[in-house]
C-alpha cells in the first residue's frame, strides 16, 4: 500500500509499505479518505523535538474513514464485519499543545 512517510522534520515521501495484518480483536481497514490536520503539520515540521514523535519515520494522518476488509481473531464478537464503513481518530493526547494544557 502507499503511504506518506515522514523521514525527518520537513522530509517526506510517498512509499510502498507493507499492509498490516489484523491482530486479535483488531480489524484491517481500507482507508478511503484521510486528512492531514494541524497536529500533523506540526509533526511534519518537527515542532515537538524530543517529545513527539519519539522517533522517525512516521506515517501521519490520524483522522480517516474507510471500510473493514479483514477481521482479526475474535473481532466478529465485537460486532464488526467485512464491508462495515468506519471512521476513526487514532492518536493520543500530546500533553503539550494548548488544547491538552486546557484539558480539551
Residue positions per predicted region:
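Short structural boundary motif marking the start of a folded domain
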Residues: 1-4
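Short beta-strand/turn micro-motifs composed of small residues
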Residues: 7
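Short N-terminal binding/cap micro-motifs at the start of the first secondary-structure element
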Residues: 10-14, 38-39
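Glycine-rich beta-strand-centered segment in the early N-terminal region that forms part
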Residues: 18-34, 48-101
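Cytochrome P450 core scaffold surrounding the K-helix E-X-X-R motif
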Residues: 39-45
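Secreted/processed peptides and extracellular or luminal domains of membrane proteins
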Residues: 43, 100-103
